[in-house]
Amino acid sequence: MQRNLVVLLFLGMVALSSCGFREKHFQRFVKYAVPESTLRTVLQTVVHKVGKTQFGCSAYQGYCDDHCQDIEKKEGFCHGFKCKCGIPMGF
């Protein structure tokens, strides 16, 4: 039952995030919808981590460059799931 609830909440968050809702909205929803327990802590951590990732980075090659040009006027580089502006990948 808990697994179904987690999957349902996650899919709902993904759907709502495409409508412009931000991490703070989801954190507030999890706080009121899920009773205080380990499950709530795990969900809040997942919401935070998903909120910090930029999935467009790995799916669309020009995403980071567009993102960094908009905010810092620098060249963008994809580091895993995060964009770094002006910091090339170093191996």
From Swiss-Prot:
Q: Name the PROSITE patterns for this protein.
A: BSPN_CSAB
Q: Which Pfam families match?
A: Scorpion_toxin_alpha-beta (PF14866)
Q: Does the keyword Metal-binding apply?
A: no
Q: Does the keyword Disulfide bond apply?
A: yes
Q: Spell out the GO cellular component terms annotated for this protein, sorted alphabetically and separated by semicolons.
A: extracellular region
Q: In which tissues is it expressed?
A: Expressed by the venom gland.
- The domain of life is Eukaryota
Which keywords does this chain's UniProt record carry? Antibiotic, Antimicrobial, Cytolysis, Disulfide bond, Hemolysis, Ion channel impairing toxin, Potassium channel impairing toxin, Secreted, Signal, Toxin
Listed as disulfide-bonded, the cysteine pairs are: 57-78, 64-83, 68-85
Where does it reside? Secreted
* Signal sequence segment: 1-19
Domain BetaSPN-type CS-alpha/beta: from-to ranges: 54-91
Q: Name one GO molecular function term.
A: toxin activity
Q: Mention one GO biological process in which this protein takes part, according to its record.
A: defense response to bacterium
Chain's role: Has a low affinity binding to potassium channels of rat brain synaptosomes. Displays weak antibacterial activity against Stenotrophomonas sp. Strongly inhibits the development of the Plasmodium berghei ookinetes. Displays slight hemolytic effect on mouse erythrocytes. Induces cytolysis on Xenopus oocytes at high concentrations. Is not toxic towards mice and towards the insect Tenebrio molitor.
Task: Report the sequence similarity comment from the record.
Answer: Belongs to the long chain scorpion toxin family. Class 1 subfamily.
The protein, known as: Potassium channel toxin MeuTXK-beta-2
